[in-house]
């Protein structure tokens, strides 16, 4: 094999490796997006089974505005109260960015009597949410 043929083969190999890596990254982000969509769908109806399936056993859910951090068990236990609060509500969300294994979401919670705009982050590993944080960024959803 000549030097030129070897260089072409090396370039093709590098391009193939780069494309394969890029496809894997895009697929992982798509999976994270699907998991986050499942999260909001389940959250809207307080679906304990789906939410428990989405959360890693050692997840930590940080609610900045309340100053608390919940375990998976604490979060699931609070769903009865949440179910009453979310009755008649709507949740809209959009992914703002995704980098370094963390996805940032802007979410609008349209409750019957008020609404709130939040910034939420999700760390996803092996199709489970391993960490989440939530902070209000506005008392209405005009910025959504």
Q: Language-model segments: what does each one mean?
A:
Residues 26-30:
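Sec/Tat signal peptide C-region and signal peptidase I cleavage site
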Residues 115-144:
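Short beta-strand edge/turn micro-motifs at domain boundaries
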Residues 1-11:
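N-terminal secretory signal peptides that target proteins for export/translocation
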Residues 47-58, 62:
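Short, well-ordered alpha-helical segments enriched in acidic and aromatic residues
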Residues 31-47:
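Short, aromatic-enriched amphipathic alpha-helices that serve as compact interaction elements
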Residues 73-119:
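Surface-exposed, charged secondary-structure patches
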Residues 60-69, 85:
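A short gly/proline-enriched turn/hairpin at secondary-structure junctions
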Residues 13-24:
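Bacterial N-terminal signal peptides
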């Amino acid at each position: 094999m000549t030097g030129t043929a070897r260089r072409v083969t090396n370039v093709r190999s590098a391009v193939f490796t780069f494309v394969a890596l890029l496809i894997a990254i895009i697929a992982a982000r798509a999976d994270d997006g699907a998991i986050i969509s499942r999260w909001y769908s389940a959250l809207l109806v307080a679906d304990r089974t789906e939410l428990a399936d989405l959360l890693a056993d050692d997840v930590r859910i940080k609610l900045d505005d309340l100053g608390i951090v919940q375990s998976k068990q604490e979060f699931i236990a609070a769903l009865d109260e949440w179910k009453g609060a979310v009755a008649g509500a709507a949740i809209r969300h959009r992914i703002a960015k995704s980098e370094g294994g963390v996805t940032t979401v802007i979410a609008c919670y349209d409750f019957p009597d008020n609404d709130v705009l939040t910034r939420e982050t999700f760390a996803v590993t092996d199709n489970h949410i391993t960490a989440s944080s939530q902070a209000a960024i506005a008392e209405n959803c005009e910025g959504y």
